[in-house]
Amino acid sequence: KVKKCKGRLANLVEKMDEEGKPQGHVGIGHTRWATHGEPSDINSHPHGNKRVTIVHNGIIENYKKLKDFLVGEGYSFASETDTEVAAKLLDYYYDGDPMKTIAKVLSEIKGSYALGIMFRDFPDEIFAVRKDSPLIVGVGEHENFIASDVPAIIHYTRDYYLLDQNEIAVIKKDSVKIYDVHGNEIHKELNTADWDVDAAEKGGYAHFMLKEIHEQPDSVK
């Protein structure tokens, strides 16, 4: 079940209080900064259809070309977003194997992005992948998370994996496995954030100015 609306997160909380919160134990969500398409309920995340649902941080540069291809294949689009294009492309290539589908889509899309993906056929799993946009996997006790940065999860866990380029994480309630695009499992070091909550918001730096200075090379890239 999808619940979304434009504006502040409080608007979504109010909407769910009025309509009833979805029942379940796996979910994805995203606070969207509008790049393709105006801020609106329909352009808000998640996007997808009955088989695939995604959230997306970043920009898909060749979304127009991919959208034209998908329209030619009979797909229609409700939003103006590049995210919906990625969702429909996943649906187009989906053959029952999420890993193969994600790898194929990664070979097609260009840009910098982080994706959180759910497949209807795999209701207990979240798939996550990144290219040039940050993405971490938080490891908790009988709960796991994906987020763009540590401050989003530090109230729930301090343990996390840093995903590298084109690595695919498969997240379940009690397990996290990470693979390359060829399906080979990767064993990564588990990191632990030893900062307090205030420091976490500064990324481990003493103050925000230092954080911004050290982030400038990545911003320029």
Question: How does the language model describe each region?
Answer:
Residues 1-221:
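Conserved short alpha-helical segments that host acidic/polar catalytic motifs at enzyme active sites
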